[in-house]
Amino acid sequence: MGSSLSIFASIWNRFFNNAEYKVIIVGLNAAGKTTTLYKLLLDEVVSTTPTVGSNLEEFVYRNIRLLMWDLGGQDLLRSTWNQYYINTQAVILVIDSTDRARVNLIKEELFKMLAHENLKKSIILIYANKQDLKDAMSPTELSTLLSLHSIKDHDYHIQACCALTGQGLESGLDWLVSHINKS
């Protein structure tokens, strides 16, 4: 009997769960944002080119419907990110963990986002990507360099990952869906 109830609940949630959450995926160019999105969505690595503008995909994960906006990370496109902030419940920040030269730039972009009125209630998932490479900074090192300890008004989580293999992506998404309802 319990099994049939859980099947019924699953079907009910699939068709009648109207909860939909807007998620933006941001990061500097070449961080792996689009690769991350499609590895999560399709569980495969797709050939990518630099994103000009945005990609939009709907993704259902653990009965939670996510509208995922993948935003281009080139300098000129970063100035348009704030146009996507309205009604955003979660931000996924993808960082190239080998890019030591631009840590201060990503820190500046992160804190600019956190200060924006339309993201006041958003949760932040930070993927420390490219952990498969030998010179990758650990999540602990990135946390220190980005001064994550100073984030007081947002729930956040930093997750080591490799978008090419998928390592760490599901753990990060588990954190996101478990916290998105609370935002």
Swiss-Prot record:
Pfam families: Arf. GTP binds at residues 27-34, 70-74, 129-132. The keyword Nucleotide-binding applies. GO terms for cellular component: cytoplasm; trans-Golgi network. GO terms for biological process: intracellular protein transport; protein localization to Golgi membrane; vesicle-mediated transport. It comes from the Eukaryota. Keywords: GTP-binding, Nucleotide-binding. GO terms for molecular function: GTP binding; GTPase activity. Belongs to the small GTPase superfamily. Arf family. PANTHER family: ADP RIBOSYLATION FACTOR-RELATED. May bind and exchange GTP and GDP. This is ADP-ribosylation factor-like protein 5. It comes from Dictyostelium discoideum.
